[in-house]
Each structure stands twice: as structure tokens, then as C-alpha cells.
Amino acid sequence: MPVQGSQRRLLGSLNSTPTATPHLGLAANQTGARCLEMSIPDGLFLSLGLVSLVENVLVVTAIAKNRNLHSPMYCFICCLALSDLLVSGSNMLETAVTLLLEAGALAARAAVVQQLDNVIDVITCSSMLSSLCFLGAIAVDRYISIFYALRYHSIVTLPRARRAIAAIWVASVLCSTLFIAYYDHAAVLLCLVVFFLAMLVLMAVLYVHMLARACQHAQGIARLHKRQRLAHQGFGLKGAATLTILLGIFFLCWGPFFLHLTLIVLCPQHPTCSCIFKNFNLFLTLIICNAIIDPLIYAFRSQELRRTLKEVLLCSW
């Protein structure tokens, strides 16, 4: 967290462009070429972070309160919410402290600021990695529940889920510490990109296979009841649309950030790449947006969780 300028060293010094006055327009890069630069107002960034924070706190609270939600599936959803909560909270904290330093409202020695920056960077990076891991874990859990339905409760037990969760958190913290320490090495950035692509491929393969199985099942039912063919076609279209939305949101929110990392390795000095680097804060904002959307996709669709959430909100009043 540099004392001057609101650039983030988080995932490091990945972006060397300080945040300018919020605008959307053409800006000149170092070579004189003109490119589109979109700076995100700090107020908007903090507001989105706050929405994500509240949403995910509600999810974690509801799952913790209701013992019926202490199954492996909801444990993964709870950990996803906790990861998204940390992503939003750490970015909000970094932005807020940076604004206070710039305004002169907060005085701190450079060494203290550097230590705080390192801690926030590790929290942010580890929560991003764990968020991706738990998205993959949820996909695997759903895949097993469909293809191994009869053996699901013997395969995905609560102790195994807890061990998997512990392994994900430990691995995320260790890897993020190494990534932050060696952020200026191309191999580190490539590892992050490969990890993202692996999660994308894993989710795509599992969800496409699940959709194919569901369509196959619906087709079998339609053969027994010929009148239901139109319903089967509608089911296939609805399933395809749901899958497209799920994977599309994942790619749209996370893809630009990892494209940014890829271009740092491939073309750090190219004018076109320099234009993309200027939108680093936009890419972070998209990740915050993903943290807002995740509860809507994975948590709030559960009737039991929504009922518990209503009880929590009513009790708070």
C-alpha cells in the first residue's frame, strides 16, 4: 500500500498506474498512443465492497446458526462466503487506509505502512485463491451428488469435507505468501494464471457433464410420456442458459484480472498492453462484483437458508 497514490502492490505491484480522478475516456500511454482507461471512483469501490461484505456476513451467520445447514455442501458454501468476505474486506481496508494517508488524516511510519501492506496483500491473495478453490469444491460436490447419488453420503462425509477445507485454507495462505514474496517473478504470475485456467476447465467439464446427464434423464422420461417432449426441450434450454450464466459470470469477473497477469509476462512494454494495465482497478472491481453475485447463485437459492436468514434479520430488529 504505497503512501503516495492509491495504486495497490497487492498481487503486487502488478499495476504501476496510480488511480486517477474517476473518468472514462481516452488516455495517452507512455508511447503516446491513446487508449481507453476507466478509473473506478473510490466511493463506488467501497460501496460495492460494503454490499459484498454484508451479503456474505449474512450467509456465514445463517449457516452457522442453523444446524440443518451443517452439511458438507453448506460448509463449502460458507467457506466461499468467508473467502469473498475477506476479498471485499481486505480491499476496502486497503482503499480506506490509502485515502486516509493521502488526506493526511492518518500518520504512520513507512515501515509500519509496508508491514500493513504485506499483511493485507497476503489476506487478499489467499482469499482470492481460496474463493476459486471453493468454487471448484462446490462443483465437485454437486458432481458427486448427481453421478454417485447412492454413495454420496459415504464419499462426501463431514470429516472429509473439513479436512478438504483445512487443506484449502492452509495451501491458500502458504501459496499467497510465496506469491507476494516473489511477485516480480514471471513464473509466479504464470502459476496464478494456470491455476485460474485449471479451475475454469474443471468447472466447465463438471457442469457440462452434469447438464448432459440431466438432459439424458429428462429425455428418458419424455420417451415414456410423449406429451412431455416440449417440456424436455424447454428443460434443455433452461439448463444450457443456467450453465452459460454460471460460467459466464465466473469468466467475466475473474478473466480480466488473470488476463492482466498474463500480459505482464508476455508484453509488459507493449503500448496495447500498457492500455490494459491502466484498468487494473476495474479488474479488482469485477472480482468484488463476483463476491456480490456468488451468494445469489450458491446460497440464497436455498429455501432453508433463506428461512434462517429471515429469522436472523427479524431477531436483529
From Swiss-Prot:
Gene3D superfamilies noted in UniProt: Rhodopsin 7-helix transmembrane proteins
SMART domains membership: 7TM_GPCR_Srsx
Cytoplasmic compartment spans: 64-72, 141-163, 212-240, 301-317
A biological process term (GO) from this entry: adenylate cyclase-activating G protein-coupled receptor signaling pathway
GO CC terms in record: plasma membrane
Glycosylation sites: N29
Keyword Ribonucleoprotein carried by entry: no
Chief location of this protein within or outside the cell: membrane
Membrane topology listed for this record: Multi-pass membrane protein
Lipid moiety-binding region (S-palmitoyl cysteine): C315
Protein family membership: Belongs to the G-protein coupled receptor 1 family.
Subunit organization: Interacts with MGRN1, but does not undergo MGRN1-mediated ubiquitination; this interaction competes with GNAS-binding and thus inhibits agonist-induced cAMP production. Interacts with OPN3; the interaction results in a decrease in MC1R-mediated cAMP signaling and ultimately a decrease in melanin production in melanocytes.
Name of the protein described by the UniProt record: Melanocyte-stimulating hormone receptor
Organism: Macaca nemestrina
Gene name of the encoded protein: MC1R
